[in-house]
């Protein structure tokens, strides 16, 4: 090839450019590692369409997709945590609170809403796991009690979505006290005969699983949710035995009778609406009440006349 041909060949080379793909359009499943379209995943309520893995979801997103659109009122939103003990581990507690509030845009780890589900009045609460592992502390307990009080005042059911690592160690005994506090509040729901439905999501551990999460009239879990008091790694190190496959997962607990149902997240709203309509003896909007009709057959009518005639003759 001559020098002139080399120049001509170089001039014909076209420059290629990388396509500018905006960030956040694609994401990867934590379980199957498949690349997923972000918008499709959001439409599926953060459930992987490939392997059905239920990813973690924020408390407000959960309540927004669960309750009817429109009039919802937040309860206890003004309550904020305080560092009464001046607790410090590797970091000051007040600094941990500030960092969690900045990350999640929430004041604490529980969000409570008053609204409707398929037209039925309900009070719903959801844990925010991104806020210090959804740990239960004074404000969480106070907001949960506020939810119970509102349900009692409105004479309506209470629903709670749990996702927590347990009691918050930075508040010591005050966080442990919330176990008794929330349990006592739920006893009032039972006295009034109002339904309390507990939905356990991944993970529900520690003091939350040992109190409000397991006290539902109906205990429901999402698929493959980790539910228990101590984690499987801690148990294995303590008993020095290999735990069975799927130990502490929702399927394992259902087989052992520890929970009542496993419901996929996309089906949760319709399932709970159906359950509450039966528990509260309300018909869902758009459904016709069942009317039992009895039509007497001619033979039955004749038999009744014959029986009454015989009685008169006697």
Swiss-Prot record:
Residues 25-294 form the CoA carboxyltransferase N-terminal domain. Its cofactor is Zn(2+). Its EC number is 2.1.3.15. GO terms for molecular function: acetyl-CoA carboxylase activity; ATP binding; carboxyl- or carbamoyltransferase activity; zinc ion binding. The keyword Lipid biosynthesis applies. Keywords: ATP-binding, Cytoplasm, Fatty acid biosynthesis, Fatty acid metabolism, Lipid biosynthesis, Lipid metabolism, Metal-binding, Nucleotide-binding, Transferase, Zinc, Zinc-finger. Binds 1 zinc ion per subunit. Acetyl-CoA carboxylase is a heterohexamer composed of biotin carboxyl carrier protein (AccB), biotin carboxylase (AccC) and two subunits each of ACCase subunit alpha (AccA) and ACCase subunit beta (AccD). Belongs to the AccD/PCCB family. This is Acetyl-coenzyme A carboxylase carboxyl transferase subunit beta.
